[in-house]
Structures are given as structure tokens and as C-alpha cells.
């Protein structure tokens, strides 16, 4: 079904305003990477909270220079207040102590470090942390637990990546950001497509069918292949969903022990 994106923008702005107010806050903070998702969230926050929406730019030693440039251009274009904190000195210390660390470990460290900066800023400024993960990432578990997945409110968490692209066009996000390959910018050469094996234009239709057909039920891979999806695609995506499902759950706490 074709979305009315102007109505969606109004809905998300209303959602942000009401949820932040409900939690007793007037200000928000979020990480701005120069990528699509954070740009969309940034512009939505700016529409609602104006000068009370603050962006943190947190480049690492592996961040591409154009990521920072794109983030700064967005801030200038939409009058977004921002602060820059380089996390490069900290990720270099991690690299010094863990020389054999995989790229995934390094990336997770940077993601959690950024969230530490965001929550420290939120305490200092009495602001609420806003999330920037889309539904495609959340379903796939393509994010860092207690890193980029951590937040108090997420306005785009129910939008698939392809929907975020369309929303971005209606928000007048710069074409430079729209046209760049999706990337978490966690290490040199990293991209979502390389990590996931497929572009979102291929993944999202499958994710939508999985949600529609198997919400709260075991995924039937054979039924998906009968719909025409490639068998290897189905296997890879469903495996990732099942493996990372725990990332969307609250911690499991043992029930109170009552001895007989």
C-alpha cells in the first residue's frame, strides 16, 4: 500500500512530541553519523524540538571524512545544533590493548562508546536519547546491543530501510546522503550490503512477508521459497533473524524464588 509520507511525517512528529513529554523531558539528543537513518531522525527532531534537539557527531579513527562532512552539511542546512566528540583516541586505546580484535569487535566497541557519550550528554543536559535504527536492521539484528540499538524512543523503528529512503526524499534530505551506500561507518570499507550479502531492495520484500505471515510464529522457510524467493536468500535471512532475535528482547530475569 502506498504510504502518504506527509501524513507519516506529521504522525512521527506527533509521536516524538507526545512520547518525550510523557517521559517528562523537553530536550532530545541523538547521534548524527552522516548516514540516512540518523539524518531522517535528525530532521524529524528538529521539526519538533527546534533548538532543544541536539546532535552528537562522534567520528572514530576508521570513519570516512565525507561522513563528517555530510553530517555538518545537514546541520547547516536544517539549523541543527551539534557537538563533535571524536572517539578516535578511545578506539585507538582499544586497538592497542586488543591487537587481535576482529573488525566486528572493534565496530561494537565504537558503537557502545558512542552510546556512552550520548547517555552522558543526556544526563548532563537533561535530554532523552533518540534512536536511529530502522525496522530492517532490528529484524535482522543488524546492530550492536547496548550500542546503536540503545535508546529511549525510536521514531523509525517500524519503518523498513526502503521506506526510510522514501521518507528521506519527502524530508528533503540531501541527495549526497540519499545516494551513498548504506554503512555503519564502523571500519574502512564497511557497508550494509557487504555485511548482509544483499541490498535492502532485495531484503525488505522478504522481511515484509516474514512479518505478515509469521509474526509470533516460527518462520516456514519452504513457504517463503514457494512465494518465489531464492532459497539461499531465505536461508541466510531467516537464519540471521533467528540468531539475533534476543537483541530485541528485554533481559530475562529469574522469577522470585519462593521455597515451599
Curated annotation (Swiss-Prot):
The residues the record assigns to binding Mg(2+) are: 37, 137
Tell me the superkingdom of the source: Bacteria
Task: Identify the Pfam families for this entry.
Answer: NAD_synthase
Q: Which UniProt keywords apply?
A: ATP-binding, Ligase, Magnesium, Metal-binding, NAD, Nucleotide-binding
| One cellular component term from this protein's GO annotations in UniProt | cytoplasm
Q: Detail which positions bind deamido-NAD(+).
A: 112
Q: Which CDD domains match?
A: NAD_synthase
* A GO MF term: NAD+ synthase activity
Give the metabolic or biological pathway. Cofactor biosynthesis; NAD(+) biosynthesis; NAD(+) from deamido-NAD(+) (ammonia route): step 1/1
The UniProt entry, under InterPro entries, shows: NAD/GMP_synthase, NAD_synthase, NH(3)-dep_NAD(+)_synth, Rossmann-like_a/b/a_fold
A Gene Ontology biological process annotation?
NAD biosynthetic process
Q: Which SUPFAM superfamilies match?
A: Adenine nucleotide alpha hydrolases-like
Positions binding ATP in this chain are 31-38, 132, 161, 183
Could you tell me which PANTHER family the record lists for this protein? GLUTAMINE-DEPENDENT NAD(+) SYNTHETASE, NH 3 /GLUTAMINE-DEPENDENT NAD + SYNTHETASE
> What subunit structure does UniProt give?
Homodimer.
So what does this one do? Catalyzes the ATP-dependent amidation of deamido-NAD to form NAD. Uses ammonia as a nitrogen source.
NCBIfam families assigned to the protein according to its UniProt record, in alphabetical order: nadE, PRK13980.1
Q: What is this protein called?
A: NH(3)-dependent NAD(+) synthetase
Q: What is the lineage of its organism?
A: Bacteria, Pseudomonadati, Campylobacterota, Epsilonproteobacteria, Campylobacterales
Amino acid at each position: 500500500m502506498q504510504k502518504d509520507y506527509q501524513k507519516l511525517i506529521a504522525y512521527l512528529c506527533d509521536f516524538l512530541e507526545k512520547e518525550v513529554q510523557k517521559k517528562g523531558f523537553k530536550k532530545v539528543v541523538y547521534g548524527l553519523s552522516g548516514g540516512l537513518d540518523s539524518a531522517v531522525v535528525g530532521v524529524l527532531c528538529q521539526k519538533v524540538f527546534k533548538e532543544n534537539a541536539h546532535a552528537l557527531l562522534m567520528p572514530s579513527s576508521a570513519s570516512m571524512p565525507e561522513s563528517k562532512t555530510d553530517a555538518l552539511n545537514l546541520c547547516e542546512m536544517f539549523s541543527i545544533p551539534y557537538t563533535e566528540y571524536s572517539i578516535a583516541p578511545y578506539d585507538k586505546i582499544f586497538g592497542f590493548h586488543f591487537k587481535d580484535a576482529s573488525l566486528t569487535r572493534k565496530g561494537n566497541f565504537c558503537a557502545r562508546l558512542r552510546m556512552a557519550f550520548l547517555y552522558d550528554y543526556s544526563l548532563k543536559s537533561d535530554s532523552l536519547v533518540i534512536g536511529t535504527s530502522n525496522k530492517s536492521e532490528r529484524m535482522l539484528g543488524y546492530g550492536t546491543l547496548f550500542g546503536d540499538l540503545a535508546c529511549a524512543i525510536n521514531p523509525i523503528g517500524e519503518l523498513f530501510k526502503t521506506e526510510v529512503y522514501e521518507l528521506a526524499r519527502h524530508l528533503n534530505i540531501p541527495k549526497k546522503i540519499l545516494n551513498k551506500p548504506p554503512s555503519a561507518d564502523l571500519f574502512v570499507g564497511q557497508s550494509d550490503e557487504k555485511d548482509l550479502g544483499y541490498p535492502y531492495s532485495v531484503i525488505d520484500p522478504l522481511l515484509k512477508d516474514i512479518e505478515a505471515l509469521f509474526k509470533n510464529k516460527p518462520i516456514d522457510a519452504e513457504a517463503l521459497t514457494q512465494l518465489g524467493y531464492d532459497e539461499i536468500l531465505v536461508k541466510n535471512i531467516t537464519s540471521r533473524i533467528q540468531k539475533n532475535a534476543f537483541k530485541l528482547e528485554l533481559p530475562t530475569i529469574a522469577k522470585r524464588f519462593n521455597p515451599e
